């Protein structure tokens, strides 16, 4: 038996903060398993999960309003440490007899909090000292309401001029509340505070490591599928690639991967996928040449959402046909990751995350009664990448910029044609190659080229000609929810433009997209 890597676990109750997933990722980075649940869980669910500690997240609502979210009262009766962050601190204060008021001054941004009383949460942790030797912490505030009276059995640990109770604590019950966000990098000692809570106060061991996660996943796959055969749609993306490697390690030749070349991939991508997984790692892969079928289905369609649906539908059709050719396949594997699971989980009160439709395989033929294998469903994307490295996948593949599920189908604006895809593939390859050469690729979060279905006049030699236009797009972002356009050097952009126009016959003009998100989205379609 492998070690129980879920033995020590933290429960995070989500009150709707944009940072809640970041809290969970930070706890995982500390080597401790955690799960993210909606705030309105039942006592029975908490008992069943049996957490070593509970974190109450921030949230956008006001505790002073009627019907605003509250932590289940059992949280404070379970006998485990509790850590309230921002809104989580406010609801803790109110539910335990303190008081919260709306504030005229919204505190948003950097603040310095002064530690005025000793606490296990921040003992020995400081950024600087006051003139009389009191510790100061540089933190990131984002709140309107504030606690104006703490519960009777709590003490004030730290304060600011505008926030008298920046940290509160009940050391006996191991309840802690902070008005700032320790999970964001702007709170410089935030990770140390989370480590203090999770590792010291909750006494969780660091059992959640890439090597142990792999051992656990392999054993669970073997227990689930036994000697049965499994099929996986391999796209060459991070999630399906790591899923393939885990399954290959667990069940070897009982895994069949179906790789569909839809004609909408990057330059030489199909060849690279086959060489890496087939030749190098020795996986059993069915390679389907589907370019013409996808292009035929897309002919005449220019609406972006319709194109996405067509690409998804045809992929499922092709995958189904290949699955039916295989004998005795009992399981379908998918690269579902933890954020997919969170976003699809609806809260009982309706204050839930938005459910999004994923570009995973759906709708297998009814005659194929298959079970589902999802070895990554507990993992965040950064954890999937770390596991991929541990399994031997190349860094450049795992840390490549995001590529949309429908591929070039949504990077060719309007109707998708083979001519447009071929031009775009070559132009995009030049842009990416030059980013690598200039050591800029890892400095931007995402970079790609878009094909515009407009002809523009150009001069070549002594003649004029009308050829196509492409746009370069590069953005910098932390979370892909908001993004700035990347300020790439002019000489670099000039070099890329010259190469594309000179080397890709059919393109006469290159433009650079300088739109931020919002109002623009990162992808054009």
UniProtKB/Swiss-Prot annotation:
One GO cellular component term: cytosol
Quaternary structure and partners: Homodimer.
HAMAP family named in the record: GMP_synthase (MF_00344)
EC number of the protein: 6.3.5.2
Pathway assigned to this chain's UniProt record: Purine metabolism; GMP biosynthesis; GMP from XMP (L-Gln route): step 1/1
Gene: guaA
Name the UniProt record assigns to this protein: GMP synthase [glutamine-hydrolyzing]
Positions that bind ATP: 235-241
Gene Ontology MF: a single term: GMP synthase activity
NCBIfam families: guaA_Cterm, guaA_Nterm, PRK00074.1
Record-linked PROSITE patterns: GATASE_TYPE_1 (PS51273), GMPS_ATP_PPASE (PS51553)
